[in-house]
Each structure stands twice: as C-alpha cells, then as structure tokens.
Amino acid sequence: MKITLLNKLINDQKKVDKKLYLSGPYWNYKNSKTIFQLRKKGLKNFRGLESGVGTSFADNLILDFRNELNFKGRIVSSFLNIPYINKIFSGQLAVTSSHIKNYLKNLSIVYKNNEKVKNLIKKYVFEKTTEFGCTNKFTLNNIDYSTHYINMAYRIDILSNTFNFKNIRSFFEIGGGFGSNIHFLLTNFQNIKKIIYLDTVPNIFVGTEYLRYFYGDSVKDYLNTNKTKKISFDDNDKLEIICIPPWQIENLDQIIDHFHNAASFVEM
C-alpha cells in the first residue's frame, strides 16, 4: 500500500476550495472513518467482514459496527472492552456472523440459479472478481463470481442497448467506487485504452491501488500528476489509467469519447 500517496492526497486536499472539492457531511464522516481504517488495517481484505475501509462504496458487509465509527464513537464504544460487557457483545457478533452466513448462502443460491445471471456469464468475461477478500460472491462451475460484478455487467448490458462500448477508445468515470467498473470494462472491451478516473479522497486512493493490482504501471496516480498543469493522455495505444482527486478536474486537457457516472451524482 502506497502510504505516501494516501498522505499526499490528504494533505493537498486541505489546500483546495472546500465548497467545491470536499465531500458533504455524510461522506465527510465516511471518509474520515475510511482513512482511519486504511491506516489501521490497510487494503488487505477490504471487501471482507473485518474491514471498515470500503463501507458505502465497496461491496463489503458490516459485521462489527465499531469499524464504522469515527474518533468520538470509538471513545464511547470503548466501554465494550469491559469484561462482562465484552462477553455479551462477543455473543452478539456471533449471532450477526451467523445471520450473515445465512444471507450469503441464500444470495449464492439465488444468483447461481438465475437465468439472467447465467446469460451474463456466457456473454461477458469475469476475471479475478473476488480479490481482496470479497464475501458477496457465489460459485458456479467451480469459478467464484462477485455479485457486485454481476450487477455491473447487468448495467453495462442494459446501456449497451443504446450505446456501443466497442466504439470508444477513451473513458472518463466520476465516482467509480473502488475501481471495479473500470476493471470489468477493460476486461471485456479491449478497444478501451485510455481512462480517467476521478473520485473523492480517500476513495480515489482505494480505487487507484485496486486498479494498480491488475494493471501495474499502466496506472498513473496523484504522485505522478500533482505538479502537472495540463493532464492528458500519452499519444499512443498503450493502456493508460489516470487516477485523480476532484480538484484536478481543472487540469484536464483531454477530449473523451465516453463519460460515465453510475450513482454518486444522485448523492450530491
């Protein structure tokens, strides 16, 4: 995990116009919690039950509410460490864990027996969709599939009724969650070579590292671009993924074939 990248994003965010480029109250709370969780646990298994990194923008489920708390909440919740109370709380976690296991079992049954899901699996390529400890998944023909990726495939399939993704070379996404949509598109549409991915801090950090896991040096992060006055693609056909925080939208100097936003605009 590039802690220098995370720190640079956090520090530079303090210098920008807060009304334009910082999150509102809801996401500000979430972002502060995510930063704490990143520094405490890193990105390992951030899609799993034990991490609070990706709650609200990734596909993890909540097992322990303490992972969702900020500073004041963590102080108040410290009373749960009192031996007798901790025993009760541990029992509650065991019950919650049992409910989650049953939920995931039923979810798996629904997905792997759904004809639409089977058709999507035949139509699209799903590679390494359950990395970083994904629990929202099912197994079909000995292959694990993320339900989140299936849902994205369904959305792309619907969009494809009116738009042909095979006809674009460049793609710009705002609010890409943890980068999974871009991963899915690049897996299925080899014609897409140039990506701009913009999200808030620290979500953009998570998405950057997620995409770097798959695409390595093809990913350009904020450490590469923070001093660049005009951000644009290299003039070649090599894969290029430029990951930027909100304030760098002013530095973009690039024509884009397709702009995409799935959900974040409705939250603003």
Each model region followed by its residue ranges:
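Membrane-proximal basic amphipathic "stem/tether" segments
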Residues: 1-32, 75, 104
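S-adenosyl-L-methionine
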Residues: 211-252
